[in-house]
């Protein structure tokens, strides 16, 4: 018993260490967890013999349900709503198109029989939420055209459709699926998944608002809700993953008590589940078997990455007239990961196939995470898809947008009293704090002994004001014929109830004073008090 505990602790600590190292090296952490599992596995150095697919499927299903739930819980619906139609098309029809194209390729190019070809396509049909979320967050990829929200919503919602196709094909391969049975299976998967997801979410939110739950037990309650939302529809033949994702979105975007305390809890729980899942899948693999399936797996991976996925994306996004650069990034960001391997374990458990579907899928996932995951930030920059004005963290509902803090940027001119002064000697405005200093290309955290120099850009923090009644803003454009053109603000007629607070001049924002000269084309932002 103690040996197992020591081994478990060693694995967990190794995962934490690898997560830190991989982020510095730019390698996806999930890949490191898989490699660690292979290191401990039957063909690895530690040589822990593990080939219990049934046990692995159960553990991985539990891990995946929490990953799916938190994927929904972390989705900021306000940010994601404009992309919802695109995301739903990609997560439903996109999965079917991708799976169908891969199935055709496997049959005609690799000579695999029809049902098994489409089973492989179904298993790898969905993109991986854990991988996509991890890269978007860790690399802070602020993508243009709301692409981060699109990828987040698509990758979080397409696993249920891949799961549904996998279940249908496994039933067909067993000979237990007639035409009527398949129609009912599709109906049950979608209907029960949606209805139970919506119903459980509605009841849970009502209970959390009305019942006072003791501190700490709210996390227990939400954990139970997540498990319940998966188990109930699954027992009745519905899609548990779809139900879980719906409940996650509903709870994550609802106004419930202690929501901020739930975020770190589920962050930790989901992180642990990802470690467990990818480590277990690495442990279950036999690296010595990989060379036997390397060529067909590589062929499928290349076709999936450069043909099937792009064709599905370009076809489905064509009616929306999306930018080519956005389509290319969405195509490239179709990473395969945990869900694909979990479904491959399920397929291995339920078929007597001559093909090693598990290791074929395993190779495809390694290829996807290593190549696509590593190059996604690079391609985003090359395709000019990085939006410097946005923060990708806003697409997640745990982004702390409610923190009442605003930032003020200020460049130190030569004649300013702060120039050549120590921070400790500078008199800041009341209730403000100097939090950052940029000097050329260097960013510094200022201390009391830090010397402020000319052209230093300072960032000050201040409390956001509460709602102030009776204040309204208006805009006024200065034209060439305007009587204000060419005048300084001090020369304008003074109005007690109005103040020019901002001037927008082309791409420049100016905080005015009495000596500011107004020019044609200036947009004045004026504050009026009732």
Residue spans for each PLM region:
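Cytosolic regulatory regions of ion transport systems
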Residues: 311, 318-329, 339-530
């Amino acid at each position: 018993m103690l040996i197992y505990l020591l081994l478990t602790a060693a694995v967990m600590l190794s995962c934490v260490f690898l997560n830190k190292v991989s982020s510095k090296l730019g390698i996806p952490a999930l890949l490191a967890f898989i490699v660690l599992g292979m290191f401990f596995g039957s063909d690895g150095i530690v040589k822990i013999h593990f080939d219990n697919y049934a046990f692995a499927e159960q553990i991985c299903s539990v891990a995946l349900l929490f990953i799916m739930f938190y994927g929904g819980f972390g989705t900021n619906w306000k940010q994601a709503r404009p992309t919802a139609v695109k995301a739903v098309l990609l997560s439903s029809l996109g999965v079917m198109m991708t799976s169908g194209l891969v199935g055709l390729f496997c049959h005609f190019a690799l000579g695999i029989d029809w049902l098994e070809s489409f089973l492989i396509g179904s298993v790898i049909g969905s993109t991986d939420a854990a991988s996509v979320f991890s890269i978007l967050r860790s690399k802070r990829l602020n993508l243009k055209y709301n692409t981060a929200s699109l990828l987040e919503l698509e990758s979080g919602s397409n696993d249920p459709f891949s799961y549904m196709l996998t279940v249908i094909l496994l039933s067909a391969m067993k000979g237990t699926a007639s035409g009527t049975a398949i129609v009912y299976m599709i109906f049950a998967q979608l209907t029960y998944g949606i209805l139970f997801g919506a119903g459980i979410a509605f009841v849970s939110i009502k209970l959390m608002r009305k019942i006072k739950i003791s501190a700490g037990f709210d996390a227990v309650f939400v954990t139970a809700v997540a498990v319940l939302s998966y188990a109930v529809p699954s027992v009745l033949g519905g899609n548990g993953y779809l139900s879980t994702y719906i409940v996650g979105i509903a709870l994550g975007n609802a106004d419930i008590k202690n929501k901020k305390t739930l975020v770190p809890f589920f962050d930790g729980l989901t992180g642990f589940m990802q470690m467990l899942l990818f480590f277990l899948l690495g442990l279950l693999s036999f690296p010595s078997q990989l060379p036997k399936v390397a060529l067909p797996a590589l062929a499928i991976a290349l076709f999936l990455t450069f043909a099937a996925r792009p064709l599905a994306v370009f076809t489905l996004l064509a009616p929306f007239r999306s930018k080519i650069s956005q389509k290319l990034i969405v195509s490239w960001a179709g990473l395969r990961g945990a869900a694909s391997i979990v479904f491959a374990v399920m397929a291995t458990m339920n078929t007597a196939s001559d093909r090693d579907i598990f290791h074929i899928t395993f190779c495809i996932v390694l290829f996807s995470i290593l190549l696509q995951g590593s190059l996604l930030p690079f391609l985003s920059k090359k395709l000019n898809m990085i939006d410097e004005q946005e923060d990708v963290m806003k697409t997640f509902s745990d982004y702390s947008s409610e923190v009442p803090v605003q930032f003020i940027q200020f460049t130190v001119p030569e004649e300013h009293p702060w120039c050549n002064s120590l921070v400790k000697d500078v008199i800041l405005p009341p209730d403000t704090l100097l939090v950052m200093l940029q000097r050329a290309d260097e960013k510094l955290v200022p201390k009391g002994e830090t010397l402020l120099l000319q052209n230093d850009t300072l960032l000050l923090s201040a409390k956001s004001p509460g709602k102030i009644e009776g204040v309204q803003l208006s805009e006024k454009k200065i034209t060439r014929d305007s009587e204000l053109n060419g005048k300084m603000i001090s020369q304008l007629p003074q109005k007690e109830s109005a103040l020019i607070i901002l001037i927008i001049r082309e791409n420049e924002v100016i905080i005015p004073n009495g000596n500011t000269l107004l020019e044609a084309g200036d947009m004045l932002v004026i504050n009026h008090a009732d």
